[in-house]
């Protein structure tokens, strides 16, 4: 009987040890087309995966802040978010600010991020970087014992979906 009780206790202990689950690590992502990121993050939201921001997440990459629940995002000390106004190519081939897309982006961000952006003049063609203590005050820290492995994304002129890196690990 003691053996069965001990065995049952061991099984319950092992079962309660926090199951491994998928973790997505974002690093060195300079953004790209808004629609691509909206689709990617919609799928990620439905997956239930946790997002680790561990490096640059700029431009359309920052849509992750509005698409993924706040409690499923964590940041490392290396995390940097880059925000700017949305743009399109004008008739002459030059970048032209798109006010409607800029407003859509802005409205997707959590209120504390919108407040931070507003305090710095709003979304403009110039990049605003949120990092360090200010960013860590908004999002929970990542525990890097999650053992998330990384695969460097290939370099392309327009970043694609492979610039979000998937890894397996545990968050504690």
Language-model features: locations:
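N-terminal secretory signal peptides that target proteins for export/translocation
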Residues: 1-2
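Bacterial N-terminal signal peptides
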Residues: 6-15
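Generic macromolecular interface patches on structured domains
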Residues: 7, 74-75, 145
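Sec/Tat signal peptide C-region and signal peptidase I cleavage site
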Residues: 15-23
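Charged, glycine-interspersed solvent-exposed loop segments at helix/strand-loop junctions
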Residues: 23-26, 35, 39-52, 91-172
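Cleft-lining beta-strand/loop regions that shape enzyme active-site pockets
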Residues: 23-91
